[in-house]
From Swiss-Prot:
Domain of life: Bacteria
Encoding gene (name): rpsH
Species whose genome carries this gene: Staphylococcus aureus (strain NCTC 8325 / PS 47)
Assembly and binders: Part of the 30S ribosomal subunit. Contacts proteins S5 and S12.
NCBIfam families: PRK00136.1
Protein's name in the database: Small ribosomal subunit protein uS8
Record keywords: Ribonucleoprotein, Ribosomal protein, RNA-binding, rRNA-binding
Length: 132
């Protein structure tokens, strides 16, 4: 069976693994998932990202990050633009997540970037998800 929304599946897997405090998780790889994972790593939400080659599409291995006393670094993940209802924003209308404490993942003509980077580069795009 084909997957309708692979990005929502990725976010759900990360959310579920985070809730039960798993150290790592694996998911089917794609280019957009790699870009999202790299942003999560650079913004400090996850520890590391590995790409494992297999006979099919490859596997992304994400290593989740926890603070002192095993507290979660990722408090929330929310899919915004869905296959049935796409959400777009201009650079001037780019949303701030929790007044700048979180990030919005934005798919632009320059690839997947954060809301801060989109404002800086003055590009709009599709709001993929919020992470805080």
């Amino acid at each position: 069976m084909t997957m309708t929304d692979p990005i929502a599946d990725m976010l759900t897997r990360v959310r579920n693994a985070n809730m039960v405090r798993h150290e790592k998780l694996e998911l089917p790889a794609s280019n957009i998932k790699k870009e999202i994972a790299e942003i999560l790593k650079s913004e400090g939400f996850i520890k590391n990202v590995e790409y494992v080659e297999d006979d099919k599409q490859g596997v992304l291995r994400l290593f989740l990050k926890y603070g002192q006393n095993d507290e979660r670094v990722i408090t929330g993940l929310k899919r915004i633009s869905k296959p049935g209802l796409r959400v777009y924003a201009k650079a001037s209308e780019m949303p701030k997540v929790l007044n700048g404490l979180g990030i919005a993942l934005v798919s632009t003509s320059e690839g997947v970037i954060t809301d801060k980077e989109a404002r800086k580069r003055n590009v709009g795009g599709e709001i993929i998800a919020y992470v805080w």
